Regions:
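An aromatic- and glycine-enriched ligand-binding surface/loop that stacks and positions planar moieties
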Residues: 1-2, 62, 81-83, 108, ...
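Short, well-structured active-site flanking segments
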Residues: 77-89, 158, 371-384
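Carbohydrate-binding/catalytic loop surfaces
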Residues: 207-232, 328-331, 335-337, 399-417
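Active/binding-pocket-proximal capping segment
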Residues: 356-362, 372-401
Length: 421
């Protein structure tokens, strides 16, 4: 992004995190190898599937593998459109692998059908031993991936505003508004099944800050699926502020932009310069959405028992070859070290799916399908803002109105809110 901004980006600059093609197909091949041989020797170990049936572990492992295959197909499709679908075949070295691309629609149908087929074969949250198996693929993860796939499939990029209209390899041949409804219904079903009532097994963590350092439990019901990392302080030492030494030394590798900081609301739920709180350029972080403090380390932030000085040349942004290009550092994903004297080993979970995404996906799909936002759309966004600590306002609308009196946002205004959330 920095090289783009200053005009120094070129074709020789690889964006490693998004240059994917061979790795997903490597995973797909490994899944197919597993599927072709796993039943040769049945497991004696058993598990309980999503329907409560006792089954051999083979069945769960096959379903988990197919989930990963569907996940990586989607990672390909959202970048390239239609890609070759291999199915279950394990190709050998001398076989013809010059397979034609499937259409975008064929790929979406394949991914969704795979997820529908495996959801009952997987285990369901809560798992009996969270510490040992919370990271295992579960039925909620399969359904969450399906919702994400359906939302992408309904989006303008693949429908009414494709890159190349009429090219079925990179989108649908024609727009169908009902695709929004299909995505909304899938998310609604998830919410009603797992996130509603006294026996709900999914929900929002009480504290946004804790989402990325806790796995699923009865107390923390937000995380659906994550990649587990070892207990360490790698994230803190890699991304913590510069200008500190010893056990609280950081390398400041992630520098959030001003655009991201400005995206955080005022604490009344309105965008900066729009609500009752007047945005002060001399005190730009005052009266803001509490999530700002949980996401960004800025000038004046408390961190490792110090007050940060992040202006260029300040104690935590020294001039030289290594400094923060934006005067900001990442806070999100790190442990609670505001008042600590040094970094300690901390659990860091790379969350792939969480309940907050389900609420947002539902709100987006429902809002796009209807001509005006429904109460259910308001409820989804209000739940997120209430958890964040946004003020409820006189009518308990958490800023989701232009006059603090009525539910009067248009579809376009609600779209802006959802996209910002």
């Amino acid at each position: 992004v920095y090289k783009l901004a200053i005009g120094r980006y070129s074709a020789s600059n690889l964006i490693n995190s998004d240059m994917i093609w061979s790795d997903p197909y490597l995973v797909i091949r490994r899944v197919n190898i597993l599927l072709s041989g796993i039943d040769v020797v049945p497991f004696n170990t058993t598990y309980t599937d999503a329907l409560g049936n006792i089954r051999r572990l083979n069945d769960s492992m096959k379903a988990e593998a197919r989930f990963l295959r569907a996940y990586f197909y989607f990672e390909l499709v959202k970048r390239y459109g239609g890609v070759p679908i291999i199915g279950d075949k394990v190709y050998e070295l001398n076989e013809n692998i010059e397979l034609p691309r499937s259409t975008f629609e064929q790929c979406i149908k394949y991914i969704v059908s795979e997820l529908d087929d495996i959801k009952d074969d997987l285990r369901s949250l809560p798992l009996p031993d969270a510490a040992a198996s919370a990271h295992v693929v579960n039925t909620q993860a399969a359904q969450a991936l399906k919702i994400r796939v359906l939302l992408y499939a309904a989006s303008p990029l693949f429908n009414e505003k494709p890159i190349e209209p009429g090219n079925e390899l990179i989108g649908y041949a024609s727009y169908d508004r009902e695709r929004w409804k299909i995505a909304a219904d899938a998310a609604r079903n998830f919410i009603n099944t797992y996130g509603t009532g006294d026996g709900a097994i999914m929900g929002l963590d009480d504290n946004f800050k804790n989402v990325f350092t806790n796995w699923y439990s009865n107390e923390h019901k937000e995380v659906i699926f994550f990649r587990e990392n070892a207990m360490d302080k790698t994230v803190e030492t890699a991304n913590g502020p510069l200008g500190l030494s010893g056990a609280k030394q950081g390398n400041g590798r992630t520098n959030p932009t001003q655009n991201l900081v400005d995206a955080f609301l005022m604490k009344d739920g309105h965008f900066i310069k729009e609500g009752k709180y007047k945005y002060d350029e001399q005190l730009p972080y005052a009266q803001r959405d509490p999530r700002l403090e949980y996401t960004i380390i800025h000038n004046g932030s408390s961190w490792v028992n110090s007050t940060m000085e992040t202006w260029q040349g300040g104690a935590n942004n020294p001039l030289g070859s290594s400094y923060s290009l934006t005067s900001y550092y990442m806070r999100k994903f790190m442990g609670d070290f505001e008042a600590a004297n040094e970094y300690q080993d901390t659990q860091h979970n790379w969350v792939m799916f969480r309940y907050a995404e389900i609420l947002l996906n539902f709100a987006e799909a429902e809002n796009e399908y209807l001509s005006t936002p429904s109460q259910a759309v308001y409820d989804a966004i209000i739940a997120l803002r209430r958890r964040a600590g946004i003020e409820h306002g006189d009518k308990n609308l958490y800023g989701l109105t232009t006059d603090e009196l009525t539910h009067n946002l248009t579809q376009a205004e609600m779209r802006k809110v959802i996209q910002n959330e």
